[in-house]
Amino acid sequence: METGRRRTIPEVEILARLPLRSIARFKSVCKRWKSVIESDYFRRLFGSFHRSSSTSWSIMFRTEYLREMTQAIGFHGCKTWDLPKSLVSYIMPFQEYPNLPTSEYYYIASSNGLIWIDVLVSRIKNKVYSYKSFVGNPVLQEWVEIPQPPNPWVQDKHPWYPSPYSGVGMVTRVENGVVSSFKMVRTVQMELIDRRDEGMYLWRVCVYSSETGLWTFKQVFSSRPVHGGRVDSPVNLNGVLYMWDRYMFSNGPGVLVAHDFYGADDQCQVIPLPGANDEHEHEHDDEHEHVRRCLTTSGEDVIFIEVIHRILKAWRLHNKESERWQLIWEVVMPSFISDVNCFPLAMNPFDTYIVYLWDRQHGCLVSGYLQAQEFIVHQESENGSSSEGDCCRVNTSGTEGYMEERCDGVLMLSQFVLPSWMDSVPRPPN
């Protein structure tokens, strides 16, 4: 019988099997470990060991004035990161300003694991407040302070103090699975539209790039107005911001106004939304006044969801260039769900079989497993487990506060999804 030698597993392999929260601690042990962990080889090795693991995420509301930062539902404790608590709990207390009231932190947007927050740091005069902006990864407690945008009104004697409501959204560039840069988009003025010229609307924005560390002004043209100052954050995917618009007095779904902030084009693309009550027909038809809609993403797809009288439909943007939508779900929901006050919130960031809804009549959050047509009612701060042992946290009281005045329109909540690797926050050159 052949006798074999006992094989020892290299230290690097042992380390790569740990969750990212544990690996992050080893980076500070010594320069050698830091160099090993930040290498491409180690990142690929970690990915091979955790290929079937999920990552943590939260469905977030964009913070409204005098409200606290709120998530509707979140999953944590996954094997990739092994977090003991929800993602939003890592944002506050904010390490840069730990003693500020929670109502003075504004969640603006998220993209590929990075979040943008504005912090109200002081009152200047005449009820004008001073804000600071930060982009970072709250779990790693790694933040980059963003300089203030330049004053667009150079001849104005009064300085320009951008408010959190001028923040439109954030986009990122991913190379080889790692976030290499980000851009932040602010509107120049609250009216958003400066003028209408030859049938085209002019949208003036100020864009910050982590590649240069500078804000630059940009003019973008669109055949429909860009309402970037709405309560919700625009949906972002692959460098593109998707914003919503609809003609006044219309009950139809409206259109998406999309722009690629990493592209060279200065034109927005207008994409008609599918669903009940076409924009140009039955504009005063009350039959569809209780249609509830949301725009979300799942995987690499933009998803549009519509609920009317317990019938849920979901479409995938099949081809952005041709503006084609593909119907992927049509499901009749059970009778215990409200027939007129059920609002779709979002789709699972990784699974198009799972959707999340808010039942305003009963004040509860509902998850729907569409393939099995099973719907589950969740209670406040419920802790549940998935097949992988992920922890679920539901915030019904916070969601109720944000949803109590919702009626029509297209809801767009922000998906804060941790990456499958602990990318460093892109920083501008010195």
From Swiss-Prot:
CDD domains cross-referenced by the UniProt entry: F-box_AtFBW1-like
Q: Which domain of life is it from?
A: Eukaryota
Q: InterPro entries given for it?
A: At3g26010-like_b-prop (IPR056592), F-box-like_dom_sf (IPR036047), F-box_dom (IPR001810), SCF_F-box_component (IPR050796)
Q: Which residues form the F-box domain?
A: 1-45
A Pfam family that the UniProt record links to this protein: F-box
What PANTHER family does the record point to?
BNACNNG10540D PROTEIN
Q: Report the protein name in the record.
A: F-box protein At1g49990
